[in-house]
Amino acid sequence: MKSKSSRTRVAILGSGSIGLDLMFKVKASEQFDLKFVVGRNANSDGLRLARSCNVETSSDGLDFLKAHEDAYDLVFDATSAAAHKVNNRFFSDAGKFVIDLTPAKVGRLCVPCINLDDMGAEQNVNLITCGGQASLPLAYALKQAVDEIDYLEVVSAIASRSAGIATRENIDEYMTTTEYALAKFSGAKKTKAILNINPAEPGVRMQTTLYAYARYRDFDRVRASVADMVEKVREYVPGYRLVVEPLESQGRITIGLTVRGRGDYLPEYAGNLDIINCAALAVASHRHATARLGATQ
């Protein structure tokens, strides 16, 4: 087991479902020393659970992290898009590395299987949205295999119980940021993102369907590119898999996927939350390894 002095000191801002699942993931890793879980409501179930796991908590939010800025190196921000824009003013001034799990689009957009190695010098890394983390690998794989994408549409369906307050409050930002990222990573001329929240009980597993009108010369190349990308995603999201292999009909390409969560804290059907947390952990692990390498040179 690594000594605490060799671990990256971590604070989690936000004590909802994403923050708590991150807490369990961080605590299970020998790379990190979890210092704080911080929220806004002293009586919240999230902070109560964190305390029961022997993690120091506070309901003073950003003010607490300002007062303890020397005690952590990395922050996972699992609040809201609006809150993150305020939070990052302090983190930027304080030189703190931030992994943003909101659709605020303040920092550099990251999908680990696409551009993780480019994140080394960034102060703020934005993980776009859960639907983005699911669909963007496939959108990027398409880009590698076709001549041009005229239109790209992504429809994600998630269980109502996995859509917390922050998710519902950020719907507009979710659409805008996902569509922006789809255009950026695929080069598509026009993009559209749709999020369906399914109230069915028991909760249904996250599913995402990608539709594209694209010009290509070899559809086998499309299939191969998508298959290769799925394996890259599965390196950090084991529950990621295709349910509809690439299909072509009258110029339209269809690909379907599902994400089964790891079940660290969230139920397995909440793959939408698990995939963005797995991406966050991949970014944090990369930064930890980069920092350790720099310290030995």
From Swiss-Prot:
Keyword annotations of the record: Aromatic hydrocarbons catabolism, NAD, Oxidoreductase
Phylogenetic placement of the source organism: Bacteria, Pseudomonadati, Pseudomonadota, Betaproteobacteria, Burkholderiales
Classification via InterPro entries: Acetaldehyde_dehydrogenase (IPR003361), Acetylaldehyde_DH_C (IPR015426), NAD(P)-bd_dom_sf (IPR036291), Semialdehyde_DH_NAD-bd (IPR000534)
Natural source organism: Burkholderia pseudomallei (strain 668)
Reactions mediated catalytically: acetaldehyde + NAD(+) + CoA = acetyl-CoA + NADH + H(+)
KW Protease (keyword) present: no
SMART domains in the record: Semialdhyde_dh
Protein name, per record: Acetaldehyde dehydrogenase
Family note: Belongs to the acetaldehyde dehydrogenase family.
One Gene Ontology MF term: acetaldehyde dehydrogenase (acetylating) activity
NCBIfam families per record: ac_ald_DH_ac, PRK08300.1
Enzyme class per UniProt: oxidoreductase
Record-level GO BP terms: catabolic process
Pfam families: AcetDehyd-dimer, Semialdhyde_dh
Record carries keyword NAD: yes
Positions that bind NAD(+): 15-18, 162-170, 272
Record EC number: 1.2.1.10
Highest rank taxon of the organism: Bacteria
Active-site residues (renumbered): 130 (acyl-thioester intermediate)
CDD domains in the record: ALDH_C
